Amino acid sequence: MRPFIDDAKRRVDRRLSASRQSISNSRMFASVLPERLRNDNDDDDDSQVDFSAPPGGMGPREGHMQYMHQSIFGMIAAVGSRSGFHARYDESSDSDGEDESRARKDAENLSATAGALPKRSGNESPRLSPKPQSPTPERGRRHRRTISDHKLLRPFKLNSKQNKGQEPAVQSEPQTGDEMSRASTPKRPRSVTPRAAPVLSRMVEARALLDTEDSTKGAPSTTEEIRDEGPTQKSASALSLRLKEMFGFEAPEKVLVEYACSFLQSMLLQGYMYVTEGHVCFYAYLPRKSTVAIKSGYVYKRGRKNPKYNRYWFSLKGDVLSYYADPSKLYFPSGHVDLRYGISASLAEPKDKGREVKDFQVTTDQRTYYFRADSSSSAKEWVKALQKVIFRTHNDKGSVKISFPIENIIDIEESPMVDFAETFKIRVVESEETYAIDEYYFTSFNYGQDAFNFLKGLVADTPMKRSQQTLSPQPEQTSRSRRTRGSQNRWSITSATSQSRGIGKSGNRRRSASTGQFSFGHDALSMSPPMRQQDSSLSFGNSFEQATEASGILQSMTDTTESASQILNRSDVFQSPTIRTMRRGPSGAEKTVRRHSDETARSVHTTRNGPEIQYAVSESDRDTQTPSGLHPSTPALNELVRAGVYPLQRAAGFAEYLKTRSKQMSNLLASESMGYLEKVSGMWAGGGKHYGESENILPDDQAVDPEDLEAGCKDGDRFREHFALPPSEKLQASYFAWLHRMIPLYGKIYISQKKLCFRSLMPGTRTKMILPLKDVENVDKEKGFNFGRHGLVVVIRGHEELFFEFGTADTRDDCAVTLHKGLESTKFLMASGLLAECEEKDESESATAEHRLLQEARLDITGMHSSRSAMAASNELHPIFDDPRASIINFKPTESLRITCLTIGSRGDVQPYIALCKGLLAEGHRPKIATHAEFEPWVRKHGIDFALVDGDPAELMRICVENGMFTYSFFKEATAKFRGWIDDLLSSAWKACQDTDLLIESPSAMAGIHIAEALRIPYFRAFTMPWSRTRAYPHAFAVPEHKMGGAYNYITYVMFDNVFWKSVAGQVNRWRKKELGLKATGLDKMQPNKVPFLYNYSPTVVPPPLDYPDWIRITGYWFLSEGSDWTPPAELVDFIQRARKDEKKVVYIGFGSIVVSDPSALTRTVIESVQKADVRCILSKGWSDRLGDPASAKSEVPLPPEIYQIQSAPHDWLFSHIDAAAHHGGAGTTGASLRAGVPTIVKPFFGDQFFFGTRVEDLGVGICLKKLNVTMFSRALWEATHDERMIVKAHKLGAQIRSEDGVDTAIQAIYRDLEYAKTLAQARSNVSSTPFSPTPSAKTVAEQEADEDVPEEEWTIVEDDTELEMRPTVA
């Protein structure tokens, strides 16, 4: 994968070099263009002339036609850059003071390890661990296990991202097991705040007491003694060897039986149970993380200090629970909860008995978050989903392992829970010295009874074997060591259910019902019980240190053999056993005993990332590594040492508390003020930084301070912490800039491998943005909103544009080039299918290897019936069907429907409906198209019924071309000259739609929604351009010359709806009363935004906006393939073959039936541009001087041999034989050229052509020309036929469009939304007058006004209901 990435980067570097030229205005650099196309003076007469301009006198000014985007919304665009809100925010900010102080503290902690680190060659930054992992000290990850140094997985290591850039010398450097374990527990680079005493602290206290009792009984003091005592099985099977390595047994143990079963806790964990001679083991391979949202919905959240609950949209994706104030703005979270550091998720305690609980809480190592769902069932679903994520994050490497000795099993009994599976419970005692009992529940769908019987018999035979072992002292010693080892570590899942058990003098001991034990590896025995006595007595005071508070998440696996699984240790893995009260009592010292590997080795001041770092910080802790003979061996001496150490450590803990609480005051000291001022001044000075592979600042940046080079890795740590990103997300560059939303926000831009992030640095603001690069379509450079600033526009799929401003042009250009490099690499990985693999490969790679080795070992076993049965069971489907993507409801109606499609306009408006009706015919329905008379033969040719709608489309086209579609001048002329035309249109449409069960209408026809209300039938809308309100795109008839942002985009729809309705409201309401028998209506009563909408363009061309409701669907193009029935002329085929033989590119040029002021000049422009670009052209000349300037009438210009003129040809055949297409940008023509996968040049003239021209350019598959002259057109032709980047993008986009089936998707959408449309029709009819009664009722004016107020009250959308409309559409 790496060579492909390098190639992509080199390819981008060649095109996006340091020339700093405008990416949006100069797509190809001048050095690439041929000499004939270069023009040093672009301000000459030709480059400024537009030969495609409309006839003089038709526009209001300058003799040129003012199109729609210039006539209605000009005033909005004019005032867009007037207001400057930045002046009030010029004051310096200290919002990062806490982060800077924390980073400074981390730097001091890391400085002690510099001498122990191996030196690296070159500019590569030193790494804190020989393992190829990020040098960032991940917070809260000390309980995690590293995998790359495991002796089992080392030969099977795969090429992951973490291995890139690793030097062979470091990889081969030998390490001891102790060093590896210390290197695998990076410290937490975060100030830890004190929190409440843990729920399970009594369990830990009892555990400490147990350790103290164990220390008086003696045991072997070295690992070598224990290893020598256990006999090895030379004839062990492959499965036994794998289990020995995976579970850390002393010697291979014969596998007696295995079963496919599930471990039952708050979740059902499917895996395998292996019963060996000495242990019962369970292994489960966890599935990979999901990159899609696991659960989402509205939940109330309580503030940190404010007890009020606020409603947010929550989304649980990966390891992060994010919440948003607006679900349509998913790139701007209001906050997040990082579940990688989660402890528990549980329902709140009910205040009243019998009352359903809707509150739940999530506890992390930092704080507790309180939530409230809408119902108790929703709360339970959230808790269950959160528990699964927390469980998985604590087993992040992909597998879970449980192991406990058979001799520790007390009993086994059946525990029926479900009817279709056998469930049994195993009760296990922790060790012979304690009464703590763990319970494990296992269930199996096929072999539960067999497993229960076998284990019950095995448990019954265990006392006999144990009594036989006492005859020999050597086996007794081995057995005893196994029991000790088995009880040292235990595994747990967070559970709200716990049970209390009494243990001696330590009081009630609270135990999780799901805790268990597992076995150690060889390195676990390097600490003998005498050693354990010492560290249990001297680790008391460390509970006051900050690292100890967070170390509750840790598990005592520092000394164990590394494995791919993350086995959680006891229930204190979720709670820190920190003692808050400083009371003295008779048993206080006993309650505070800790294990060395759990607490004392994890102090904040202990730097353990290097291979030579010691465990402890005090002399008493260092004594734990001395020979066992130096340790006190009696309880009395132990108590004396403990009593002497207690006051000193209590005082040290209190001093640490004061030091942490006074960190803000320390920032104000004179010794720190200069560094703070330097950082703030640097923040406001702006600029940017680049980071290398190891996140060190690249030395070729301007004004790089040597201290910044050392702090580069900490920038990456803070970046991942700010946005809750995984360690694999490497920081590549950062810039200071302004983000323009409602007001300009000054902050910092972060660019990583797959993310573009922003964080506000303004006081009082908490804006954050997390934008995946795969959702970014393009990056354009534009002028800034304010004088002296330089703008950058980020175009996002299905979202409004983002505007950034930079202080200098160089910084802006550098950010643009860096983003384009990232986009190129991301899109290349997406196209090759490598991006999805990279997102999950690192996390599950080692577990997959371990799982594969275990499966291979299982296959090696022959003659074992249980193994074969387990293999068969693993291939069986789970009996519970739970696939959210599958539909269990058949939405297709049982009877055949009479469907009418109502549309007006040109051929391009009718063609999509023919394709849709052909699909409806195939489904068994009876479709009918109601349109103009001139399209009747074409419609009936395809076997579709036809109904007549009055109106001359040619006349309609004339006023659209001359005035712009639906402009003010359009409505003015239509109102003055076409009142009768609109009346005829409405009346004929009413007649054409009779005998209809379902009506589908283009909203330009204006009559459909009223006809559906009168007929009480479901009503759909369908159109070729955006018509529904959104912030992502402007209205197709109001596209500005420059991107104006989401607020402008949304207001264009509001203004257009009102202008469009006001122009026809009088005639429509008279028609409603006279012919339909309905009362007068308005926009607030019709509620057009509630109508189901079908857009017949591709979601890859116009991605669905995030703020579209569920009933608006982008289905894909409705193509009508007619090319197979068309025979091309022989001259056309010969022309294409000659061009191929001459190795010339072939382009298509056709602008449709447009009206220009000088058609001869436009023809000459086309001819000269084709010759200058050195291409061959197929010309469809439809422009004319109709209604133009009579003085411009000239003889026809002869065409050269490089151009072949045609009258018409099917687009699906023609575009498949050319290299590029240049046209007017109509919806149908644009879809045909994009479907063919050829670069597209768009010269828009009116209507939606400006919108699709902008989309083509934003997608990077073509060029949108604002003016048409020889200079610009010839460059565009040459670039479209020679720019490999554009050609590849167009080819890939064409393949995506061809893979879609827009007609079938539209039909399925109709089926799904049919019931919803029926409810709307019924609701409208209930508040309307009686239909089918053309005679108006004889009511007074006052009565009619009173009636008209009723539907307005019932149908007006209130603000609280908008959240139901703004649900994001799931594609």
Curated annotation (Swiss-Prot):
Any one GO biological process: autophagy
SMART domains: GRAM (SM00568), PH (SM00233)
GO cellular component, one term: phagophore assembly site membrane
Composition bias type Polar residues, residue spans: 18-28, 466-477, 486-501, 1325-1338
TM region(s), chain numbering: none
InterPro entries (alphabetical): ATG26_PH_GRAM1 (IPR048066), ATG26_PH_GRAM2 (IPR048065), EryCIII-like_C (IPR010610), Glycosyltransferase_28 (IPR050426), GlycoTrans_28_N (IPR004276), GRAM (IPR004182), PH-like_dom_sf (IPR011993), PH_domain (IPR001849)
Enzyme nomenclature, EC number: 2.4.1.-, 2.4.1.173
Compositionally biased tracts (Basic and acidic residues): 1-16, 591-602
UniProt name for this protein: Sterol 3-beta-glucosyltransferase
Organism: Aspergillus niger (strain ATCC MYA-4892 / CBS 513.88 / FGSC A1513)
